[in-house]
Swiss-Prot record:
Cell compartment(s), UniProt: Host cytoplasm; Host nucleus
Motif (LXCXE motif): 22-26
A single BP term in Gene Ontology: DNA-templated transcription
Protein name: Protein E7
Zn finger region (unnamed): 56-92
Native species: Cottontail rabbit papillomavirus (strain Washington B)
Chain segments carrying region E7 terminal domain: 1-42
HAMAP family assigned to the protein according to its UniProt record, in alphabetical order: PPV_E7
An annotated Gene Ontology molecular function: DNA binding
The family this protein is said to belong to: Belongs to the papillomaviridae E7 protein family.
């Protein structure tokens, strides 16, 4: 640069622009066994048994069962049983 104000013609680029790959070469499969075990442990600790009791669609007899799932799954089951999903007892199936 010559003078007090820079001029575009005086700028000299030292390097030319090159295309740069932004692709990440890491893979989730490369997790160590410890990381996978930690993830599985966290998942297992989130799952717990839930007792569910619902009336039979036909005879209104109570149907009870226990399922093991995480809190999100039991909320989904609750929404389904409250809306469109109905269960039928073994006697009414025949």
């Amino acid at each position: 640069m010559i003078g007090r104000t820079p001029k575009l013609s005086e700028l000299v680029l030292g390097e030319t622009a090159e295309a740069l790959s932004l692709h990440c070469d890491e893979a989730l499969e490369n997790l160590s066994d410890d990381d996978e075990e930690d993830h599985q442990d966290r998942q297992v600790h989130r799952e717990r048994p839930y007792a569910v009791s619902v009336p039979c669609k036909r005879c209104r007899q109570t149907i009870s069962f226990v399922c093991v799932c995480d809190p999100e799954a039991i909320r989904t089951l609750n929404r389904l049983l409250s809306a469109s999903l109905s269960l039928v007892c073994p006697e009414c199936c025949n």
